[in-house]
Amino acid sequence: AAAGSEPILNVLPMQAKKFAVITTGSEVFKGRIEDKFTPILVGKLAEYGCEMTFHKVCDDDPAGITAAILEAKEAGCELIFTTGGMSVDPDDRTPLAIRNTGADIVTYGAPVLPGAMFLVSYLDGVPVCGLPGCVMYAKRTIFDLLLPRLLADDAITAEDIARLGEGGLCLGCAECHWPNCGFGHC
């Protein structure tokens, strides 16, 4: 009776999704450096049966990034990820570009390391996430904690992100045992 008419436990199935990667940064856009982030995302999402159906490389121009996000949504992408431009440098304009799409920003910033500069938002129900650089370098990050929920269409709230503060420090163990460790578990 404590739960009322609601079930005590509700299991949401994860579903393979079509996703977009919007790579940002003048260094990649102008060909000075290779995009090494996208292949990592493709690999991580392939583990869940997801397919990248849209990819665009943008300069550090908020209008161009905004347009690419909107184009990805129009192309039917069910998840949209941006890479680059998520820090606090003056030319890091990706959070502004996401906001300019009209997306509802849930949070920009999280009490999780690695992953403090993570942004999650929803554009007409489609998750748009700004991924910090750590997702490319660290074995496990906030992205790994939240991806299963995104694939299960489980809406992420600011309260959910705040709760990650307890257990939100990955210890970077020499041999990773995640998810069988304290990272992401409170």
PLM feature spans:
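Short, glycine/charged-enriched hinge/interface segments at domain edges or termini
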Residues: 1-53
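C-terminal and late-domain segments of enzyme folds
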Residues: 184-186
